[in-house]
């Protein structure tokens, strides 16, 4: 959610036959905004497998993870005053961690400093707001998502068969 109540969400192709080919998939895998007044808008329609989504702390940048096996990356978009987005770009290339078509950058959260804690095969990447890799949390498993705990400084990380918990020195921007 954006602070004004607008809901931004992705509609990935997961669960459809032929996820990463053209057979049996929905015509658009996109990023949408459901405004607080109920209007639904397709904002981005050129991402093959949009997945995780989050805002920078100042809400001027929208981040989206793309699990496309040919372009696994976290993407960044400028958020305009009217809530639409522009100037999409690769924020961080995650191809080095792609293991197979179903494991690329996945769910993520942004901390109060604007750093991304992003799930990916083998662990979590911590990426600064300028796109620099700050570090990694290696788990050896394909990670699926992260969430902040109630205290805002505990990071929960999910994998296929495990849940990890780690206290971090930074903290949640929002829950």
Where are these regions (language model features)?
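Beta-rich, blade/repeat-based domains predominating
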Residues: 1-7, 14-15, 25-30, 40-61, ...
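Short loop/turn segments immediately following the C-termini of beta-strands
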Residues: 12-14, 67-69, 79, 121, ...
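A short loop-to-beta-strand structural motif that recurs across blades of beta-propeller domains
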Residues: 29-32, 73-75, 123-125, 162
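Short coil turn/linker residues within repeat-based beta-strand modules
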Residues: 36-38, 81, 130-132, 170
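Short loop/turn segments immediately following beta-strands, especially the blade-tip
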Residues: 76-85, 167-175
């Amino acid at each position: 959610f954006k602070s004004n109540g607008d809901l931004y969400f992705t509609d990935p192709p997961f669960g459809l036959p032929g996820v990463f080919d053209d057979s049996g998939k929905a015509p658009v895998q996109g990023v949408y905004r459901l405004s607080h007044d109920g209007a639904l808008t397709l904002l981005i329609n050129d991402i093959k497998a949009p997945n995780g989504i989050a805002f920078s702390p100042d809400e001027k940048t929208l981040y989206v993870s793309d699990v496309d096996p040919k372009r696994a990356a976290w993407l960044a978009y400028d958020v305009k005053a009217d809530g639409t987005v522009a100037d999409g770009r690769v924020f961080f290339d995650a191809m080095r961690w792609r293991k197979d078509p179903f494991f690329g950058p996945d769910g993520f959260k942004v901390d109060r400093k604007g750093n991304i804690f992003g799930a990916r095969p083998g662990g979590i990447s911590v990426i600064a707001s300028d796109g620099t890799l700050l570090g990694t949390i290696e788990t050896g498993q394909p990670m699926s998502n992260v969430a902040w705990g109630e205290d805002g400084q505990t990071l929960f990380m999910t994998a296929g068969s495990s849940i990890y918990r780690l206290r971090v020195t930074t903290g949640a921007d929002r829950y």
